[in-house]
Structures are given as structure tokens and as C-alpha cells.
From Swiss-Prot:
SUPFAM superfamilies: Ribulose-phoshate binding barrel. Homodimer. The lineage of its organism: Bacteria, Pseudomonadati, Pseudomonadota, Gammaproteobacteria, Lysobacterales. The gene is pyrF. Pathway: Pyrimidine metabolism; UMP biosynthesis via de novo pathway; UMP from orotate: step 2/2. This is Orotidine 5'-phosphate decarboxylase. It comes from Xanthomonas axonopodis pv. citri (strain 306). Keywords: Decarboxylase, Lyase, Pyrimidine biosynthesis.
Length: 243
């Protein structure tokens, strides 16, 4: 059975994508952003450095929330074993691929900690032509909602999906299902590899629980100020929603 969304404070709804190649660079970013960011996503690049769990431990010691974004996809027994071990760490979110119902159910049954599992639906870098090339001649939103419902039925706690689909997902799944939206672009589209993007406020108005932001903060002339500006947008959107 899916668990209720994490009880996130307003300042914990911004997740910074810590897409750097080393422990030292990761911690430098955490120190640089200070109190402006309380939640960090760590993904594949840090895994390849061999320092992944050192970073995870360092974040936990700084009282930061951690999102493990490794998009697990394997046979059910292998994924279940991985989730069982990972649930022993101080992790708030973890991603698994949303393509296999049996694997999702096994992952959900193995998750005995407070970690929330998020199913990957359709990557925000993909559009309809990419789906067609994979033999799926449907609109991304339809595929995403279908996978969100399948994930919930399997006991997964939520999804990671484009903000463009936050509204349809929320209407389909109801309030007790986590929606985390990556590819957020505070100033609008910027012509990078993200295709299905939305702004900060729109994601929350449409039902997101949290957003993931990377380059708009990392490439800003003043990253902490950029994060603070996003936090202000989040607070305003939550007030508009009555949260």
C-alpha cells in the first residue's frame, strides 16, 4: 500500500540536483548553498565516483534530506534486495523505473523504512517522437498517468514526472500520492535537453509535492540567491493553494 507523502516543510520542497563528479565538489555546493537548500538529489555521476555513500552520509550529518536518484530497474528479487539495504540509510526519496509491475511490487514490499519510493514515468527529456521511436504511439501525459496509477496499485509511494503532468496525475491518484517534478525552469524554457518543463509556481499549483532544480541554480551568478528566489516562489504558490 502506498504511503502518504512526506510531511515536508516549505523549505524542503526545493530539491537541488547535486550533479557533480566528486565528494569534495558535492560538499562544496552544500556549504555554498547553506540554509537556502535543505534537500539534495544525488544521482549516477556521483555513483561512478565511488564516493556516493560518503556524500549521502555527509548530507545526513548536516541534517539535509537525501533523494537517491538511481532509477533501479532489474529483476524483482535484485531490486527488492537493493531497496531493503537502502532503506537502512537516511534516505527520503528513491527512484525505481515504472515499467514493470512485478518489480514495483517487490520494491514496495521490501521498503521497511521511512523512505518513499518514486516510480520513473517518462523522462522530462523525452517527447512524443521519442515514445513513438520506442513503439509507444501515445501522448506523454497519457503514458505518465497510466504508469502513475500502475505504480500506486503496486504499492509505490509516488512518481517523478514532468510538472506538465502534475495536474493530471493528482486528479487521477488523489492527495495521498507523492509527485516530485524535475526539469523545473524558473525563468521558462532555456533550450537545453529538458523538453517537458514548467515554472516553479505552476508545478505546485498543479499538485507537486516537491521540485528538482539543477542548472538554474548551479549556473546562476549567485546560486544561493537563485535558490532563495525559488523558495519565495514556492512559499507564494503554497499560500495560493492554502497549504
Amino acid at each position: 500500500m502506498s504511503r502518504a507523502p512526506l510531511p515536508l516543510a516549505a523549505h524542503e520542497r526545493l530539491i537541488f540536483a547535486l550533479d557533480v563528479p566528486s565528494h569534495d565538489q558535492a560538499i562544496a555546493w552544500v556549504d555554498r548553498l547553506g540554509d537556502s537548500v535543505s534537500f539534495y538529489k544525488i544521482g549516477m555521476e556521483l555513483l561512478a565516483s565511488g564516493e556516493y555513500f560518503h556524500v549521502l552520509d555527509a548530507l545526513a550529518k548536516r541534517d539535509k534530506r537525501v533523494f537517491v536518484d538511481l532509477k533501479f530497474f532489474d529483476i524483482p528479487a535484485t531490486v527488492a534486495g537493493t531497496i531493503r539495504r537502502l532503506a537502512q540509510w537516511p534516505v527520503s526519496y528513491c527512484t525505481v523505473h515504472g515499467w514493470h509491475a512485478g518489480m514495483l511490487q517487490a520494491a514496495a514490499e521490501a521498503n521497511h523504512g521511512d523512505m518513499r519510493l518514486l516510480a520513473v514515468t517518462v523522462l522530462t527529456s523525452m517527447g512524443r517522437p521519442d515514445l513513438v521511436a520506442m513503439g509507444i504511439d501515445r501522448e506523454p501525459v497519457d503514458v505518465v498517468v497510466e504508469r502513475a496509477l500502475a505504480a500506486r496499485a503496486a504499492g509505490i509511494d509516488g512518481v517523478i514526472a514532468s510538472g506538465q503532468e502534475a495536474g493530471p496525475i493528482r486528479r487521477a491518484t488523489g492527495p495521498d500520492f507523492s509527485i516530485v517534478c524535475p526539469g523545473i525552469r524558473p525563468g521558462g524554457p532555456v533550450g537545453d535537453d529538458q523538453q517537458r518543463t514548467v515554472g516553479v509556481a505552476q508545478a505546485f499549483i498543479d499538485g507537486a509535492d516537491a521540485i528538482v532544480v539543477g542548472r538554474p541554480i548551479r549556473l546562476a551568478s549567485d546560486p544561493a540567491a537563485a535558490a532563495d528566489a525559488i523558495q519565495a516562489e514556492i512559499r507564494a504558490a503554497l499560500m495560493q493553494n492554502g497549504d
